[in-house]
Amino acid sequence: GVNINLGAHGQLQGLGAHWELWMLEQGGMTNMQALRAATMNGAEYLGMETEIGSIKEGKLADLIIIDGNPLKNIQDTENVTHTMINGRLYDAPTMNEIGNKETKRTKFFWELEGSGNAYPFYQQTQSFMRPVCHCRM
């Protein structure tokens, strides 16, 4: 047989990773097999099973805490309450660091005043309304 891994083709993970996990279960895997595909199989494929993929002393502390039991309901993987990255614990809804050192997260670039605000320019010039061809005939 072959190992099945959860993963994308280069795009960032996100909600799609949960959907893919759920589809593995819908395709016939047990919840444990699907969770293994999302964790340990990928670590083994990368040759990093001694560093990542499961919870064990000495491994990197990157994990999520879920409100629910994905072994009973695989869709509980969506109910992330906390995330641990490199041993630092974060509150999932706020993304603030909690635990030993409480730190409020900084704003993302799209939350900054005026970021990505090209619309007034296009509204003034009406250039978003006109088809433009820069080719030479």
Regions found by a protein language model. Give the residues of each.
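Active-site neighborhoods of metal-dependent hydrolases
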Residues: 1-27, 93, 98-107, 111-137
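Short, charged low-complexity intrinsically disordered segments located at boundaries
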Residues: 52-54, 69-73, 111-114
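C-terminal cap of metal-dependent C-N hydrolases
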Residues: 40, 44, 60-101
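His/Asp/Glu-enriched, well-ordered alpha-helical/loop segment
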Residues: 1-66
